[in-house]
């Protein structure tokens, strides 16, 4: 692999954090490489640091996409939530359901860590395009402000202010640190209570001021506005469970590097749930139902289903029933 192509993974990491969309991140990186290969060999050789050039171009493309994305969201049906990432065991290793993932798929290019938790991405989405790009370049990817200024097209001082403003937004929204085991336990208990249609148990797990946000994109049924309050959410969740089809299943999965849930019908992912936990309660639930945002999950569930179908059924020698 050439040194230029070796930058692809890092660029996808960068673009996903900037855009909150795997598909848009892939488009941005493809456009970046298209511009590189549109240059002559002499022009390419004249560039002292190809990696820096690629980063600058990709960041500016993302900056432009963020501006147009805001305009598109004015006509978006319902709430907009960033695209969820499948669990690292399926994607970060390049394996999907035990098979090699398509190397062109951006989902297996993203490093799963705290900086792309759903709560973090949602706060990023509240920033201006310039704030978001400056913050990600400096605070997440550790670029010096002099380089950030060159990329964003503003002064060093202006970029410091942008990053500082973004940092205040992050700190204002951050919940106190939660141990991974506690987070996983809360999500698991929520699943059990939801499966049991136990309203009281659900209320006990939810913050009284909790919020449930759904993104259907106008393509599937979804609440158009956030549902507020622990008791309302509990009753809403139980109402959904009572209407759930017999071919449905609720599964524990890792979503953006943290414990989450996935709803499937006939083995196909139809909703991905991400959670924010604070002070021993669930503070926010994001439910992504827009099928355009679930493509990596549907690929994964298809591979899981195929792997299951490929397994031989147990023969008589595996039976545990005593027929004597």
Question: Which residues fall in each region the model found?
Answer:
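Active-site-adjacent scaffolding segments
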Residues: 2-192, 198-201, 205
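N-terminal regulatory/sensing modules of transcriptional regulators
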Residues: 190-196, 201, 281, 313-314, ...
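Short loop/turn motifs at secondary-structure junctions and domain boundaries
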Residues: 193, 243, 263-267
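Short acidic-hydrophobic surface loop/beta-edge motif
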Residues: 252-253, 263
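Exposed beta-sheet edge and beta->alpha loop/turn motif
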Residues: 258-282, 286-289
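Low-complexity, intrinsically disordered terminal/linker segments enriched in charged
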Residues: 288-324
């Amino acid at each position: 692999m050439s040194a230029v192509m070796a930058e692809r993974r890092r660029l996808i990491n960068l673009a996903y954090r900037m855009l909150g969309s795997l598909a848009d991140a892939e488009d941005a990186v493809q456009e970046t490489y298209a511009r590189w290969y549109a240059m002559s060999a002499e022009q390419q050789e004249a560039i002292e640091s190809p990696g820096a050039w690629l980063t600058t171009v990709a960041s500016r493309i993302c900056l432009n996409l963020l501006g147009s994305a805001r305009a598109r969201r004015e006509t978006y049906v319902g709430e907009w939530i960033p695209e969820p990432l499948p669990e690292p065991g399926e994607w970060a290793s390049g394996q999907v359901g035990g098979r090699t993932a398509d190397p062109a798929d951006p989902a297996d290019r993203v490093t799963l860590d705290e900086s792309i938790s759903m709560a973090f991405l949602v706060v990023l989405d509240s920033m201006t395009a310039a704030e978001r790009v400056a913050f990600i370049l400096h605070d997440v990817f550790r670029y010096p402000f002099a380089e950030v200024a060159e990329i964003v097209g503003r002064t060093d001082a202006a970029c410091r202010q942008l990053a500082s403003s973004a940092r205040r937004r992050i700190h204002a929204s951050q919940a106190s640190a939660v141990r991974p085991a506690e987070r996983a336990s809360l999500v698991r208990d929520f699943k059990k209570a939801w499966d049991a249609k136990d309203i009281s148990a659900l209320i006990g797990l939810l913050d009284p001021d909790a919020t449930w946000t759904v993104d259907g994109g106008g393509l599937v049924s979804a609440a158009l506005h956030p549902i507020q309050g622990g008791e309302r959410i509990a009753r809403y969740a139980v109402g959904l469970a009572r209407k759930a089809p017999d071919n449905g299943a609720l599964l524990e999965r890792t979503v953006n590097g943290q414990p989450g849930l996935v709803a499937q019908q006939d083995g196909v992912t139809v909703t991905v749930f991400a959670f924010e936990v604070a002070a021993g309660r669930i503070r926010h639930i994001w439910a992504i139902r827009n099928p355009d945002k679930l493509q990596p999950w549907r690929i994964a569930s298809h591979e899981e289903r195929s792997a299951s179908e490929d397994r031989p059924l147990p023969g008589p020698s595996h039976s545990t029933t005593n027929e004597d």
